């Protein structure tokens, strides 16, 4: 039992630690460098004792100082001499120096009261530099051996290197956005730049178009447009749907004509629908897809039709009741009283020379717009927009009708916002705001507008965005300022527009200085939307910004999803231009 208990590890369960000899912990578990260093010092002394006759007593005294250590290290074999291959002569000289250091440090060790027992084991005795270097070398070699023998020390750094590899070396799958099927099959997208707003589909990549790129019925290769056309315009005017029927009839034909239908925004569904439609699936499975296409087209056309009615009604209403304050939109250019007030001069236009011409052309354009709408996509209206460059023609009208409290109120962005609302659509809604209630944008912000309908005084136009305030530096006089206001219209129709441009929604009567540098919160985030396009010359590029005929469907502008409920076209561009100039003026 005795050998098993003390030295036979088969009988030791690890709990009876006191049964071992007192020197067990240091003898079997001595891995710390402090014990090794003291052991090395002692072994050097013991190894060199025979050759140190004159100073033998002092070394013995030094050995007594190491009493507790020498007891523990009786059985530890001293490998230091073998490891370092030190000759007897070197050891004797080193031991002599060590003896002197021991004498010097004896007083120091005795002075320390409680740490006296621990000091020999916690740190090596102060020896000369060579001895310490020797000991350090031995310790380093032993530590390296321990590192080789210790699996935990081995695996530790390896794990670190495995977990902390640079990302480039790791075999991670690249985080790429899942590529849409557009890379292989482009989806029918309403493209205003292509002829008649038809969809553009690169048929060179189609499996079922063996004769190369499809030609439109006009004989020109289908245009591919870049820019906004790449975006999915879900609220575009819906072109006619005959091509879908043709596709169903001529399924076996070589060139498949895709119906120019605007998709509803669901990319995968549209790809599947389009594949079904172009003959990748059998006819039985394609019928539901075709039905969905037709339903989409009917819905879109139905949405576009009321708007055209609004436009025609608006033209008639504006021309009939231009004298009335409500319908006249507050801008009667004196010479052309019969012209619908929609003829807004462009900012910085050449002059009033073209005022009458632009008004007349605009009136005829408004009447034609309903008929030309489906195929033109509002391009005719936008073109007519470029024909209205006069500023002075508007002055005579509202100067005699409206007075604005502030000379600044008629600044350009306000004018442009007026322009946004004079378009035929809003003209029908200006009388009172009945059809405006149907427009989602206004419905969303009704509370915000009613908030400010309290002050429907002539000063309300001052809510024009800070752009408005500083827009027309040359026009500071009261006669120009008073021209453009119908206070009711301003509160309802223009103020949400002012908010879109980044206007301070409230504080309408705050002085112009304050409005120029309004508190930054108003200008940041949802109130500080900056227009991407600042010039009315970019009409063709911004046509896709909004469907000109479908005013019932709002367009999301800006990060906050601010809805613009009047169609953009020319008027929105004027608004953008005015706001940009006003915002960036020093």
From Swiss-Prot:
A GO molecular-function descriptor: RNA binding
Ranges annotated as biased composition (Basic and acidic residues): 441-458
Positions with biased composition (Polar residues): 107-128, 169-181, 352-368, 421-436
Family of the protein in this entry: Belongs to the YTHDF family. YTHDF1 subfamily.
Location of the region described as Disordered in the Swiss-Prot/TrEMBL record: 98-128, 141-181, 301-464
Xref: InterPro entries: YTH_domain
Residue ranges of domain YTH in the record: 435-576
Record's compositionally biased regions (Basic residues): 398-418
Name under which the protein is recorded: YTH domain-containing family protein 2
Species assigned in the record: Pyricularia oryzae (strain 70-15 / ATCC MYA-4617 / FGSC 8958)
Effect of gene knockout: Does not seem to affect growth but produces fewer conidiophores, as well as fewer spores on each conidiophore. Displays milder disease lesions on rice leaves.
Pfam families referenced in this protein's UniProt entry, alphabetically: YTH
Protein purpose: Specifically recognizes and binds N6-methyladenosine (m6A)-containing mRNAs, and regulates their stability. M6A is a modification present at internal sites of mRNAs and some non-coding RNAs and plays a role in mRNA stability and processing. Plays a role in pathogenicity towards plant host.
């Amino acid at each position: 039992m005795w050998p098993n208990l003390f030295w036979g590890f088969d009988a030791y369960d690890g709990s009876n630690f006191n049964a071992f000899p007192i020197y067990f912990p240091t003898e079997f578990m001595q891995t710390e460098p402090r014990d090794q260093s003291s052991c090395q010092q002692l072994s050097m002394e013991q190894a060199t004792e025979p050759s140190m006759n004159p100073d033998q007593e002092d070394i013995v005294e030094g050995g007594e100082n190491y009493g507790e250590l020498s007891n523990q290290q009786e059985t530890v074999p001293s490998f230091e001499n073998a490891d370092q291959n030190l000759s007897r002569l070197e050891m004797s000289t080193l031991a002599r120096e060590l003896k002197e250091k021991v004498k010097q440090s004896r007083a120091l060790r005795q002075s320390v009261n409680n740490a006296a027992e621990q000091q020999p084991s916690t740190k090596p005795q102060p020896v000369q530099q060579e001895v310490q270097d020797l000991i350090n070398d031995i310790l380093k070699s032993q530590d390296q051996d321990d590192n080789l023998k210790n699996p935990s020390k081995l695996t530790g750094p390896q794990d670190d290197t495995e977990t902390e590899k640079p990302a480039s070396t790791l075999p991670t799958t690249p985080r790429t956005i899942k590529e849409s099927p557009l890379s292989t099959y482009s989806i029918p997208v309403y493209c205003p730049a292509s002829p008649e707003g038809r969809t553009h589909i690169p048929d060179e990549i189609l499996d079922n178009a063996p004769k190369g790129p499809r030609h439109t019925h006009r004989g020109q290769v289908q245009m591919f447009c870049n820019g906004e056309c790449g975006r999915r315009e879900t609220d575009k005017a819906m072109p006619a749907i005959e091509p879908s029927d043709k596709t169903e009839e001529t399924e076996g034909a070589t060139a498949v004509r895709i119906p120019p239908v605007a998709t509803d925004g669901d990319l995968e569904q549209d790809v599947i629908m389009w594949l079904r439609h172009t003959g990748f699936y059998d006819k039985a499975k394609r019928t539901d897809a075709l039905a969905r296409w037709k339903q989409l087209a009917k819905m879109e056309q139905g949405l576009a039709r009321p708007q055209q009615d609004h436009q025609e009604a608006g033209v008639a209403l504006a021309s009939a009741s231009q004298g009335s304050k409500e319908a006249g939109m507050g801008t009667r250019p004196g010479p052309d009283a019969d012209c619908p007030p929609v003829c807004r001069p462009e900012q910085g236009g050449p002059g009033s020379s073209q005022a009458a011409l632009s008004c007349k052309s605009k009136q005829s354009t408004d009447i034609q717009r309903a008929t030309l709408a489906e195929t033109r996509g509002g391009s005719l209206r936008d073109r007519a927009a470029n024909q209205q460059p006069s500023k002075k023609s508007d002055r005579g009208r509202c100067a005699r009708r409206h007075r604005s409290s502030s000379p600044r109120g008629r600044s350009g962005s306000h004018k442009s916002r007026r322009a946004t609302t004079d378009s035929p659509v809003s003209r029908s809604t200006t009388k009172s705001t009945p059809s405006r209630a149907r427009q989602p944008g206004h419905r969303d912000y009704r509370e915000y507008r009613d908030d400010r309908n309290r002050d429907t005084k002539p000063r309300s136009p001052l809510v024009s965005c800070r752009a408005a305030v500083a827009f027309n530096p040359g026009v500071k006089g009261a006669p120009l300022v008073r021209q453009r206001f119908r206070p009711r219209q301003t509160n309802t129709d223009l103020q949400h527009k002012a908010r879109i441009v980044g206007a301070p929604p409230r504080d309408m009567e705050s002085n112009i200085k304050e409005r120029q540098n309004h508190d930054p919160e108003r200008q940041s985030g949802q109130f500080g939307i900056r227009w991407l396009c600042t010039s009315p010359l970019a009409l063709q590029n911004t046509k896709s910004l909004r469907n000109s005929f479908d005013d019932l469907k709002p367009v999301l502008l800006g990060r906050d999803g601010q809805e613009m409920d009047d169609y953009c076209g020319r008027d929105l561009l004027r608004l953008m231009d005015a706001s940009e100039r006003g915002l960036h003026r020093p």
